Amino acid sequence: MSTNELEERRRRALAPAYELFYQEPVHLVRGEGVWLFDNEGRRYLDCYNNVPSVGHCHPRVVEAIATQARLLNTHTRYLHENVVKLGERLGAKFPEKLSVCWFVCTGTEANDLATQIARAVTGHYGMVVSEGSYHGNSDLVLKLSTSSYPAKDRPDWLAAATAPDSYRGPYRAGSEPGGEEALAERYADSVAEGVAGLADRGYQPAAMLVDSSWDDNGLFVPPQGYLARAASIVRAAGGLFIADEVQAGYCRLGDTWWGHERYDVVPDIVVLGKPMGGGHPVAAVVSTPEIAAAFGKQIDYFNTFGGNPVSAAAALAVLDVIDEEGLLKNAHEVGRHLERGLAELANEHPIIGDVRGSGLFWGIDLVSDRESRQPLDRAEAKRIVSAICREGVLMGLMGSHGNVLKMRPPLPFSRDNADHALEVVDGCLCALAR
């Protein structure tokens, strides 16, 4: 069947909210490692998808799912070793106090549950998030996703702190006497203002929820000390700190397993999602025994599919592959190689205003004017990402202006893969400049 025919069938059968990437939609039929293949046999280098974190259709993950599916799939009201083992293995990846898990199916569910836990345990209702954030699409979590709707429609229990954007934000790198520490303090002041605003409206904070990569904002690297200050402010007001690791977790940033580890702060609650199952839908909330016990006294939480043995088998296989194949080290080493290559691209192409990220997560901020840092028009950015796709490399866009090229490949991404991707981006930007 042709791509056009399938697209027409899709248009009739699926709701219009389902968007397709790229000007010419890609009809994918197979994946292997860092490669995706379309219906005509053409292969694409995947520089976008972090759900298949250990590579598309990794044999260990596929076999784990198939083996367990042949035996049994049920829920957490029965004993099963896979589920217990997954909780133990995850707990071992965190500081000792973060040792208790709830299992769900998606990052949205995990953020929803984390918010419920914070509200139940603290007895407070207010929430603090970053301006321009995205955390999921349930009714509750969508309200926490300030990128998704106008500020005038926000509930009065929500405070949106200024996102720590050191490139285009109100406080920029090199602009503050006192350097990075002063910059961190400035952005943390916005959190304090948010907490004060909640108090004026009759709320105390239950928690501050932060995406440790600020992905939807455009991949920000906050000034050192910001996150610890922000968490301290919220805790002093009686709230908890929730780290949303759906994007940043599972070795994505190259130096650590979790994004928050880069900023010297231990969360009260951690949310896991996308990469956890290597392509299988599984997510989790991790917290302390004390918080778990306090929540359990109030709410008997159960999730029909969360923590099923098949999902647990997939998630255990992902942990095995990351450790045995040295994918944290690979993300670090290839990330350093990418960093150098992206810096060279930025030197050659005035359209690149900034390059941000680490490990295997990079944002290439496209601008129409470097001096003013004016974001490139969203439509033009879409044309560029579609041109890159036509050359066989899949990337995405992010940021509030839709102008930041998102580079977020599976963890087995190699130096050769990186060089190929950089060559394609370079060629497309050269063609644009002609």
Descriptions of predicted regions:
Residues 1-434:
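Conserved N-terminal phosphate-binding loop of PLP-dependent enzymes in the Aspartate aminotransferase
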